[in-house]
Design a protein with these regions (language model features):
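C-terminal and inter-domain tail/linker signature
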Residues: 1-146
């Protein structure tokens, strides 16, 4: 993570991302409030820690080695925004709203931004912004992609 003052909020964000990177779902869920909301592109809205972990696990199934690295972090009193670079290899099925994309073995690098709101020292809300065409192009799932 980029150098920032280490606060309880920053520590929770690091624990959250590290847990995702390791697919450590109990730790991932422990960083979220019971009524947390997580939103992904394409309309995936996940309510509560269990739904959030199950929803984002779709990406770990498709890209088992998927990891995120925070390259910029901006924090406020109870909010944060992170610029994240996701890297991995498409070795599992990717379930999408329009069907399942079989594994291609292709590597990906996807740039994203994620915004967070906190309640106490836990994540209450997160919204993930990433370019779906960057991901689909990398795995050859766009028309004309080679």
């Amino acid at each position: 993570m980029a150098a920032v003052a280490v606060t309880p909020m920053v520590e929770v964000l690091q624990r959250y991302l590290d847990a995702f990177n390791r697919a450590d779902w109990p730790t991932y869920k422990s960083t979220l409030t019971p009524d947390s909301v997580h939103i992904e592109p394409g309309g995936m809205e996940l309510h509560g820690p269990d739904a959030s972990a199950e929803g984002v696990n779709v990406f770990k199934v498709a890209f088992p080695d998927l990891t995120g690295e925070v390259v910029r972090l901006i924090t406020g009193d109870k909010e944060a925004a992170a610029e994240i670079v996701w890297t991995g290899t498409h070795t599992g099925p990717l379930v999408t709203p329009s069907g399942t994309i079989p594994p291609t073995g292709r590597p990906i690098t996807v740039h994203a931004t994620k915004v967070f709101a906190f309640e106490g020292d836990l994540i209450k809300y997160s919204r993930h912004y990433w370019d779906m065409t960057e991901l689909l192009g990398a795995i050859g799932a766009l028309p004309g992609a080679g």
